[in-house]
């Protein structure tokens, strides 16, 4: 009888299972509980694999909330050879995690991400000198005194956004172009002036999406459990696993794209982030750049700027959430319209000078981000040292998750948490805002992001009435509110009809629009 060839998956398991068996016999989750303190409580675990079989890939925050209701606001789960500690209490975050920032500011080691980005993406760097250096350099262009200088760019792009929505309801594409163009202008000195320019953006997003999807698939599959959570990195590097080849391919493509953008930005006239980072690093154009810059090189510079792209594009997803809230809660939208009409009137577009006089508009944004978080489990962290919290031992190297969804729906923090109430933020300005993270790992671009959300929201709701198109399927709130994974929870697609609120509003938009491919007129100078 002819012998059937082994599939790659079978071959992989044939090679790795004996190694795995030997490995798990000689390893177990961290058992050294300093001073004999126990780990935080959690659901019962199976030998070796722990709770891997119980953690759902989709909407895991609800399962963690269910567990925290049973085991308390600090709990733990075992993911094979990894301990994950989950915080579900704002009080614990405020009084413990934020006060011990240096312990809780590292990142879990995920081999696929490290391979796919060459270990150069600052968002996944462990806490240490390299991360601190990159954080300082990025903060130099993202601090409030600098982000104010980007407001002319944001104003121009949101004006074009309004003009585009006069002739199309394809708002998701328009939002992507708007936010992408803001980033490209300040980062590389190159606008995305029309939808044709999105082709280059699509390539970059495709690569980033592929990396994320591969990582998600690894976490949810058997091969991923072996490669990501059980086998040590030294052993992973020696195994003929397919994901490593995929990661190398994605890394090469992503690097080529980012380096090409960086070279072009260095050659353009005017100021941009690439040039600012190059000066800080001493990289420049490669002519007598200084010892540190020579070591860093163009590739590192390319990733330092390029890794900010995905974070910046979160603003387009956030605006989609705000638009959805505007459709589902018409009473709140009418109140925002009334405020905009009273402060701005019909003869001009809202601008940043109106911000202080638009408290309800600002509150609407905050409530939308609480109501439907983009990152319900936050960004995973790791402990750089062991710690003690409420009599429990937290091991060094533990993965740390913050259940943002649970905190945002905690009745002890937000009264009537399942009701959409923007006024809660006016009545209590000190309510926690978790959109941009917290502590030293908070998003460095949060000030720029807040500006984009304010101006985008104020102008969209000043300009348009928004509703579902005639005959469109009603929005299933459960489907839209309960979708996503541990890493991201973007909204499913939905349709919106944009109608100018009056002919006067249409006239102001048409007369205000500025569409120019001449970047020199909007490039930011220091």
Curated annotation (Swiss-Prot):
Reactions catalysed: tryprostatin A + reduced [NADPH--hemoprotein reductase] + O2 = fumitremorgin C + oxidized [NADPH--hemoprotein reductase] + 2 H2O + H(+)
Function of the protein: Cytochrome P450 monooxygenase; part of the gene cluster that mediates the biosynthesis of fumitremorgins, indole alkaloids that carry not only intriguing chemical structures, but also interesting biological and pharmacological activities. The biosynthesis of fumitremorgin-type alkaloids begins by condensation of the two amino acids L-tryptophan and L-proline to brevianamide F, catalyzed by the non-ribosomal peptide synthetase ftmPS/ftmA.
Topology term for the membrane: Single-pass membrane protein
Keyword ATP-binding: no
Name by which UniProt lists this protein: Fumitremorgin C synthase
Any single GO CC term annotated in Swiss-Prot or TrEMBL for this entry: membrane
TM ranges: 4-24
Cofactor(s) required, per the database record: heme
E.C. numbers: 1.14.19.71
Species, as recorded: Neosartorya fischeri (strain ATCC 1020 / DSM 3700 / CBS 544.65 / FGSC A1164 / JCM 1740 / NRRL 181 / WB 181)
Alphabetized Pfam families for the sequence: p450
Keyword terms of this UniProt record: Alkaloid metabolism, Heme, Iron, Membrane, Metal-binding, Monooxygenase, Oxidoreductase, Transmembrane, Transmembrane helix, Virulence
MF (Gene Ontology): heme binding; iron ion binding; monooxygenase activity; oxidoreductase activity, acting on paired donors, with incorporation or reduction of molecular oxygen
Top-level taxon of origin: Eukaryota
Top EC group: oxidoreductase
Family per similarity comment: Belongs to the cytochrome P450 family.
Compartment(s): Membrane
């Amino acid at each position: 009888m002819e012998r059937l060839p082994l599939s790659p998956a079978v071959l992989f398991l044939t090679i790795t299972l004996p190694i795995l068996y030997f490995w798990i016999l000689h390893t177990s989750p961290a058992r050294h509980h300093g001073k004999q303190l126990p780990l935080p409580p959690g659901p019962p675990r199976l030998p070796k694999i722990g709770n891997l079989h119980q953690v759902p890939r989709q909407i895991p925050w609800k399962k963690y909330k269910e567990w925290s209701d049973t085991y308390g606001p600090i709990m733990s789960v075992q993911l094979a050879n990894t301990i994950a500690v989950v915080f579900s209490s704002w009080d614990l975050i405020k009084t413990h995690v934020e006060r011990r920032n240096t312990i809780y500011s590292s990142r879990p080691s995920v081999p696929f991400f490290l391979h796919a980005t060459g270990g150069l993406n600052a968002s996944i760097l462990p806490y240490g000198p390299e991360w601190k250096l990159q954080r300082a350099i990025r903060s130099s262009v993202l601090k409030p005194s600098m982000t104010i200088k980007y407001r002319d760019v944001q104003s121009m792009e949101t004006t074009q956004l309004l003009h585009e929505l006069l002739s199309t309801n394809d708002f998701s594409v328009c939002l992507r172009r708007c936010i992408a163009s803001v980033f490209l202008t300040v980062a590389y000195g190159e606008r995305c002036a029309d939808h044709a320019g999105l082709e280059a953006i699509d390539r970059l997003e495709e690569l980033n999406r592929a990396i994320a999807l591969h990582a998600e698939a690894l976490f949810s599959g058997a091969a991923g459990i072996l490669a990501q959570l059980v086998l040590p990195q030294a052993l992973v590097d020696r195994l003929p696993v397919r994901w490593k080849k995929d990661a190398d391919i994605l890394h090469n493509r992503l690097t080529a794209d980012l380096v090409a953008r960086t070279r072009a930005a260095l050659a353009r006239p005017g100021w941009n982030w690439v040039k600012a980072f190059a000066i800080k690093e001493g990289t420049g154009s490669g002519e007598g750049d200084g010892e540190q810059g020579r070591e860093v090189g163009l590739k590192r510079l390319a990733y330092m700027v390029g890794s900010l792209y995905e974070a910046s594009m979160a603003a387009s997803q956030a605006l989609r959430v705000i638009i959805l809230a505007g459709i589902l809660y018409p009473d709140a939208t009418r109140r925002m319209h009334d405020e905009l009409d009273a402060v701005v009137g019909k003869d001009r577009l809202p601008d940043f000078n109106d911000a202080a006089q638009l408290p309800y508009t600002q509150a609407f944004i905050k409530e939308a981000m609480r109501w439907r978080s983009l990152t319900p489990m936050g960004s995973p962290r790791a402990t750089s040292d062991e710690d003690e919290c409420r009599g429990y031992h937290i091991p060094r190297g533990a993965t740390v998750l913050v259940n943002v969804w649970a905190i945002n729906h905690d009745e002890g923090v937000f009264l009537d948490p399942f009701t959409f109430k923007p006024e809660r933020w006016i009545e209590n300005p000190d309510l926690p805002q978790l959109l941009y993270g917290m502590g030293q790992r908070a998003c460095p671009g949060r000030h720029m992001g807040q500006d984009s959300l304010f101006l985008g929201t104020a102008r969209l709701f000043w300009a348009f009435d928004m509703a579902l198109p005639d005959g469109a399927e009603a929005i299933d709130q459960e489907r839209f509110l309960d979708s996503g994974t541990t890493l991201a929870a973007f909204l499913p697609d939905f349709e919106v009809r944009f109608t100018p609120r009056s002919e006067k509003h249409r006239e102001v938009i048409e007369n205000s629009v500025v569409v120019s491919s001449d970047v020199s007129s909007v490039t930011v100078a220091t």
